[in-house]
């Protein structure tokens, strides 16, 4: 018998929600000390670490020296006067110098140690293409064994061996050196000291998984593979082509900017003469949206402070140093490129998210500043003005595909004619594709391939980055890299190395996923209002707190949802200014202001389409709401990746689905299940504790129907069809009578305008005065 229960039987227990508890972790609380997603214990030499033992003599002295930093942390003078700005600056410089280890010969890890570290962080390197075949004479040294089997069995065995050998040769796994800290970049991998100081000032200490694996291979591939065995056929003297597949928010932008800036600094130091130009275009970064391109430019300029490297965003008024291309060769290449794109697409249709991104790019180009519009209008009437426009000196160019291709082709595309590349960029030695799966999708593929063909440097390096990468995109990259290598047979082909972090095409494991059934469209609106105004703590999992993003399927639905929610936040908390909508039909200046307000915390709820689903970094977003089910598993991965950036914990991704969504929601449920498996929340129907931790349980996965291939294709192209036609799927709280009244009035006004236009047209054609029309109906009052 529990005596406490007996004595407290008549006392009402205090609710749990009022009891003080541990503070909740949120992405908006600040950066995490360790931004890494994975760190498994794989045993081996590192398994014995952490056991304390007594030390004597020199060992004790070494231990004392290594623990100085920990002792200093507890030696704090709480009554010291406030330091002056000069003292703060001197202290900061001293900390920077203290972080620099003494320059010494780099110590490389053995392959077994590299294998354990890479495995603990779930890093997998694979050589996809570019391996040099070994001499056949060396492989045929051993005499063939006598076989007493029939010819048919021998042929079958040989065919199986060839298939197995070809499969092993096509994809070979390697174990390069990992990057344990950013301090190794300066002395081990020899990056420029100014660049290393900029990295330290930006607060980078512990590398993420993608930075740990990709930076050594990109900076010094020979050193990264020095201790690796069985890599004789992987020739990296001329560099490598790289394909990085890593979770959202894992630092992919820094992973390709650091090697690009460092390579430009080194080439400038080697080739510098007083006659040469200081700024030569050597690297191009291609991104699908203008917001993402602007973000990359900002990050690049922070890293390039004091290095002399210029990072510029491409605009229509920009002039670059380019060479003219021969017309015949370009037409032939354009035809080949069109045929390759048609054959590689395999009757694939454009995903809705890509179509929206393309629409956004066109809107951005059309909605440039007034000064640029005046410049363009003057340039149309005065060809001399175009020639007098100065050439922009740039080292790294960040651009969207269409605007750069228009510059290379000399104008907009004409209908029915293939794009003719009139200019080439022979100085570009590095082409970087951010969100490569979108840029190589059918709708962007021709533009991206045109830029790729315009970069004619024989030693061009290619790097591609994304959180999702389909196998057909990898095959397309391999095919075109091999084709480009065959054009220069005198050079050793660069190997194409792929890095996969964690499980491929899965969402980030450090956030909570929720799949909520709302039955109908009005149920979605009610559920979203409950998230804005939580009334009960009965719901399992962490609550969703602002700021957060709300994704819808179409622009019309985003605008309608904004009209419904803009008065839901009380005036004391900021009112309608706390809710905003952003989509591709808004002008560029308006979108920039909304983005700035959301980053500064003025906007708490940002309603948008898939335009903001990729690449854009919002460090403090606490959650994501998929008001409409994503059109694909990849779309869900990128939407959910707007929270939980850089390892921040506490983010929430909520997905609403109705009865109409049940045939399509299984792909999203599978992604959530795989993400929870990475986080250790394995689905187990026998273990009720594990089942309670996961948001997608075993019975739900079994009950949801499988999505057919044709349904997936239709969903990518059009989304859920009922939401495009309106009707019952309209986002509104108005009654059907009110909506019918508004529609009748709108149609009556349109009919009145149409009759007036017809009357004016008849008057112009006939010349006679029109008869007096009957009194027009103006609709219901």
Curated annotation (Swiss-Prot):
Its EC number is 3.6.4.13. A motif (Q motif) lies at residues 184-212. Residues 527-689 form the Helicase C-terminal domain. Residues 84-108, 139-173, 370-386, 736-752 have a biased composition (Basic and acidic residues). ATP-dependent RNA helicase involved in 40S ribosomal subunit biogenesis. Required for the processing and cleavage of 35S pre-rRNA at sites A0, A1, and A2, leading to mature 18S rRNA. Interacts with the U3 snoRNA and is associated with the 90S and 40S pre-ribosomes. The Q motif is unique to and characteristic of the DEAD box family of RNA helicases and controls ATP binding and hydrolysis. This is ATP-dependent RNA helicase rok1. The gene is drh-16.
